[in-house]
A protein has these predicted regions:
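Divalent metal-binding pocket/active-site signature
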Residues: 1, 24-25, 30, 78, ...
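Short, surface-exposed, polar/charged, turn-prone segments marking secondary-structure boundaries
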Residues: 16, 44-46, 84-87, 110-115, ...
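Glycine-rich, charged/polar anion/phosphate-binding loops
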Residues: 69-71, 121
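An N-terminally biased module of ancient metal coordination in phosphate/nucleic-acid-related enzymes
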Residues: 1-68, 81, 143-154, 214-220, ...
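Charged catalytic cores and adjacent phosphate/nucleic-acid-binding surfaces used
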Residues: 1, 92, 147-246
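Acidic (Asp/Glu)-rich catalytic clusters
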Residues: 9-10, 40-52, 71-84, 126-129, ...
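Residues that form or immediately flank small-molecule/cofactor binding pockets and catalytic motifs
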Residues: 60, 66, 88, 139, ...
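Hydrophobic faces of well-ordered beta-strands that scaffold small-molecule active sites
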Residues: 16-18, 55-59, 83-85, 133-135, ...
Length: 246
């Protein structure tokens, strides 16, 4: 985290938001729950060491609508300023599967899995869980076999718009995620077309995330993301740390 703060200052960022994962289903070997106390201590150390950098303390709740008690426990444990809600897993044959699992997204199943994923995101949006930002709305696109089957967002427009309408109704912020830098084929998560649908459905605010996971990737792809979001009808606020608005 300290290396990330140093990198933020090197590239001229006025602020950085740490949004550590709090996932409640162990789908990867060696996966552990979030040590909230240890995380908050690390944030405090960074704030003391880098007073010139605004450091926002956040958390990304994975499928909190399926694990409401565990999610509430995380949020009650300390001072969380920014709460993201996300979906990584879908239920297949009675068990949760993360779409990042190698081979899960095959050319035989992508459309069905994509719809299954978006249906779970809609469940999250409707859940009433206390998250402010909807993170990487179409996380599944990261694992779509783009080299074998082009992803046409228009084929899923109905599912996308149902999520966006519900998110707008509850006042949610839509995150545009660059996945550590915009890869030309995969693109943004979600892409400009979906961000425009967000605007059309009444969405008010947009945030940016690089999902960096390492210091060298923070803010990667933000210039391209900002251009796409601006083209969709959203504008930056005077405060560079604030959400963009319509």
């Amino acid at each position: 985290m300290e290396a990330t703060c140093r990198r933020a200052l090197e590239i001229g960022l006025p602020a950085i938001a740490f949004t550590e994962h709090a996932d409640f289903v162990a789908v990867h070997e060696g996966q552990h729950g979030l040590d909230v106390a240890g995380y908050l201590e690390s944030v405090d150390r960074c704030r003391a060491r880098f007073p010139e950098l605004r450091i926002i303390c956040g958390v990304e709740l994975g499928e909190p609508h399926l694990h409401p008690e565990a999610a509430a426990l995380v949020l009650s444990a300390g001072r969380i300023e920014r709460i993201l809600g996300s979906v990584h897993c879908v239920t297949i044959d009675g068990r949760p599967r993360d779409l990042s699992e190698r081979g899960l997204m095959t050319t035989e199943s992508p459309p069905a899995l994509f719809r299954l994923y978006l249906a779970e995101v809609l469940n999250l949006a409707r859940s009433g869980q206390p998250f402010t930002v909807l993170a990487h709305l179409d996380y599944a696109r990261r694992y779509w076999p783009h080299d074998q089957l082009p992803l046409d967002e228009a084929a899923f427009e109905e599912e996308y718009r149902a999520i966006l309408r519900e998110a707008a109704r509850r006042g949610t912020v839509l995150e545009v995620n660059t996945t550590r830098g915009v890869e030309p084929v995969r693109g943004l998560c979600p892409g400009p077309r979906v961000v425009r649908w967000w605007w059309e459905e009444g969405g008010e605010q947009v945030s940016f995330g690089s999902d960096s996971h390492e210091p060298g990737r923070i803010a990667a792809g933000f210039a391209a993301a900002a251009a796409g979001v601006e083209a969709a009808g959203f504008r930056p606020a005077p405060d560079p740390t604030a959400y963009w608005r319509r």
